[in-house]
Amino acid sequence: MKRTALSGAAIAIAATSITLAGCGSSPSSNDAPTNASTSASATPQPKVAPRVAADGPNPTIVGYFKDAHITATPVHKGDPGAPTINFPIPDGWVDAGPDTPPTAYWAIVDNGPEAAKYTPSIVATLSKLDGQVDPQKLIELAAGSTKNLPGFKGHGDGTEDNLGGFPAFQIGGTWTQDGKEKAVADKVVVINGKDDVIYLLELNADALPDQVEKALPATVTIDEKTTITP
């Protein structure tokens, strides 16, 4: 069986997670006042944790867009002229519904018992690129934003692969958000659409390190069964 991009990143996370478990690592918590903790627990939190891009030493696709004056416009299902991407929904996962980020093309969340502690999610964002785009440059810079995440510890530098017949780059590891050690698997796919318009597909898998065994089969399913029609 071919190991495709997102599943490869998840496998990298698994290796990192085993190391963390062996060291007795666990997510840390901030020293917040008791009343603040009570208030936070009473307010429903979104199942898809937001991720804010962080500045860092590694060059990124966003930086390339700024320098090359390229505009990225979010694309949603059914938008005229856009590629059609059919993602499978793996066993034990459901559509994110109202928790889907406004700019996302598609999102799913884990609905198993392990999600009671923290909800693993996989989010796909599709963007139409306007300007003079170098597709290979997108692949070369794909890992930058992931490597710039706070406290990122990668399992290697990432690898090139493909999804649905289109070139991709994947990277996985762990990072720290709000005092918690988290696992991440990111994949960037470059799609040559109609009239040679370039689209950028980004897949972001999010979980805690000890939830990777649950997330891994889902990423394998997505990598093996996703179809892309330009």
Where in this protein do the model-derived segments appear?
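A short acidic-to-branched-hydrophobic micro-motif
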Residues: 108-137
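Extracellular/periplasmic catalytic domains that process cell-envelope and extracellular macromolecules
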Residues: 115-118, 162-164, 192-194
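Short, surface-exposed beta-strand/loop micro-motifs that present aromatic residues
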Residues: 106-110, 183-194
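Short, well-ordered beta-strand elements
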Residues: 122, 196-206
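Extracytoplasmic
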Residues: 82, 117-121, 166
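Post-signal peptide N-terminal regions of Sec-secreted extracellular proteins
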Residues: 125-131, 143-149, 176-178, 187, ...
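Signature of long, low-cysteine stretches enriched in small and polar/charged residues
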Residues: 139-190
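N-terminal targeting sequences that direct proteins away from the cytosol to non-cytosolic compartments
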Residues: 2-104, 206-230
